[in-house]
Amino acid sequence: MIAVVSALGMTAVLGGCGSTGSSDVTLRLVAADYGDSAAGSSQKYWDKLVEKYEAQHSGVKVEVSVYSWNDVDRKVKEMVDAGKAPDLAQIGAYADYAAAGKLYQASDLLSIPVQADFLSQLAEAGQVNHVQYGIPFAASTRVLFYNKALFAQAGITPPATWDELEADARALKDQGVEYPYALPLGSEEAQAETMQWLLSGGDGYTDTIGTYTIDSTQNIQTFSWLKDDLVAKGLTGPVAPGKLNRADAFTAFANGKVGMLNGHPTLMRQAAEKGVKFGMVPMPGRTGQAKAAMGVADWMMAFKQNGHAEQIGDFLNFVYDEKNVLAFSREYGLLPVTSSASDTMAQAPRDKDLHAFLDQLTTAQLYPVGKTSWAAVSADIKKNIGQAVAPSGRPTDVLGRIQAAATAADSSASN
């Protein structure tokens, strides 16, 4: 999903709404777990936040159920399908629910200062037909991680262009490094590695008006370069990219077997725990630094089924207070989704480990999550993109098939 940040905050009452009234209301929130152990579960974060909120709002109770990322989207779908939608869900995708008319607009809930504080590209990514339904909750970006010890042994410096990346990978291979560049195009998260490379090649999944451009000339050139200049030359390791999952690539990096790879903030802790000394630089582009980094966001959304718009809005204004946004971001190594918290983090020495990722956020491009077709397109990419760099694969054909399916999915979604 993302390693993304949640802005949990606390604060203000919806402008002009006043108190929540005399009758008790219970809000039900289903949330994803960002912790990597029971001790670090997001449940503890929410429990503490809710305790503070309820102490200030005697007429409102908030019940939070936290599920793993493996289960949370399915759990919410089951609740909605059964006619028992939660008041709030903090999950990975909102567009289908928005298109079905099940969600409140953000402007129906949030105070103007809170709504204006979201980073603009995240707020825009929360829109369906130019109306915001998805409220950004957590964000992350990707940078190029490299193993400092392996680079020193090979006598190389971090790459800034594709040619330099290839030369570095060749030098690492000559030193016996198992994965000079790890290229995880396996089914777990191939859509992320793919998007980072498409951006570094100067294009992406869609154009500026949201039309899929998966088989554009630039994208075909990008995958042709990956196939011919990295994979075919044995610079991506012993596992075929289409069989290599992101989690396995991260583990190999933490075990000192990878020279360089794209990574998000959670890799820092994983590598540090194994004693790997690493550096981080922006993703190289074809002839210089990539024009944009890949960003990922997770979303908060509010269902209309039970009403409670006033209470939901009041709670969300509290959730997105700067102190709460920062607390959540720091706890889980994610990036703030608000300008105020981002500015604070950018100036805070304690957050220096996240500055490389934060620097990428202002120009980051996100998945086209506002398109209801994206879930099907993403699944198709996960399943098939690895074929584009396989020995018998042809990038033109593979990207063309994915584009045709994406166009069809987009057409059915809009009918």
Residue ranges and their predicted role:
Residues 54, 224-311:
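Extracytoplasmic/periplasmic substrate-binding proteins
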Residues 92-141, 193-195, 349:
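Hinge/lid segment of periplasmic solute-binding proteins
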Residues 52, 56-118, 154-160, 250-252, ...:
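Extracytoplasmic "Venus flytrap"/periplasmic binding protein-like
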Residues 169, 175, 211-240:
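Glycine-centered hinge/linker elements that transmit conformational signals in sensory
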Residues 40, 107-118, 180-188, 202-222, ...:
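Short, solvent-exposed loop/beta-turn-alpha elements that line the ligand-binding surface or hinge
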Residues 1-95, 287, 311, 327, ...:
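Conserved N-terminal structural module of periplasmic/extracytoplasmic solute-binding proteins
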Residues 355-406:
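C-terminal capping/gating helix-and-loop segments adjacent to ligand/active sites or protein-protein/ligand interfaces
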Residues 87, 114-150, 179-180, 290-291, ...:
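A structural signal for short loop-to-beta-strand junctions that line the ligand-binding cleft
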